[in-house]
Amino acid sequence: MGGSRGGMDEQNLVLLNIDHVQQKHTWDCGLACIMMVLQPHERELLSLKLFQICEEEGVDKSTWTIDLAYLLHRFGIKHRYVTVTLGVDPGFSSERFYSTVLNKDHQRVLERFQKASKQGVVVEQGGVALSEILSHLCHQMPIILLTNAHLLVCEKCARTMPHLRSCLPCSPPYQGHYILLIGCDMKKNLIYYRNPSFSSRVCYITFSRLDEARQSYGTDEDVIFVYSQFETQVTL
């Protein structure tokens, strides 16, 4: 980690040099994103003791963004979690994606939100403009983002594998999926990200399509700003 800061006016292209981590299960995409921003020894610890740490955190094969914020705090990673809903949107009960986890997770998630401030977990209510996301990336810091995978259309994947509509094909209207934003191209209006459902590769998406995927109902527009600077890389 390291590197100098730069503003949006100074950098048209930013691409952070962050090691890729592929998820091992259907439910741990957010945990894989956490691993990507950890130091190597911390990443190894979380990987080796994943189920033990999940048990200690009260996570049972379903992670919410508040859980990721608590994990970042556990590993001493400065962060800021922004969401439009402090708690659980009651409307999620009608969403197929949440139907199997809402009952078991509802109370636990509410309690984590209520205790966040005292625990040192930074949570703010509100929406995030694309300009704020771009500014953060231009300062060489990554972002953990909740998206609707059904709308996550990678331009690179669409060109090389045109039969794929999105990076994570699925049939339900909403399929929650975490990705790690690692850069942007201001001239081409692209955001670079790592998708933990794939093996190591850098995906990219247009600004407008990213907004569509991250602001889809079901995401609560959840954004975690990670305040750790990384070196930049020259090529994809």
What are these regions (language model features)?
Residues 1-89, 97, 135:
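Active-site nucleophile-adjacent alpha helix/oxyanion-hole segment immediately C-terminal to the catalytic cysteine
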Residues 1-4, 136-142, 148-236:
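Noncatalytic regulatory segments and standalone regulatory/sensor domains
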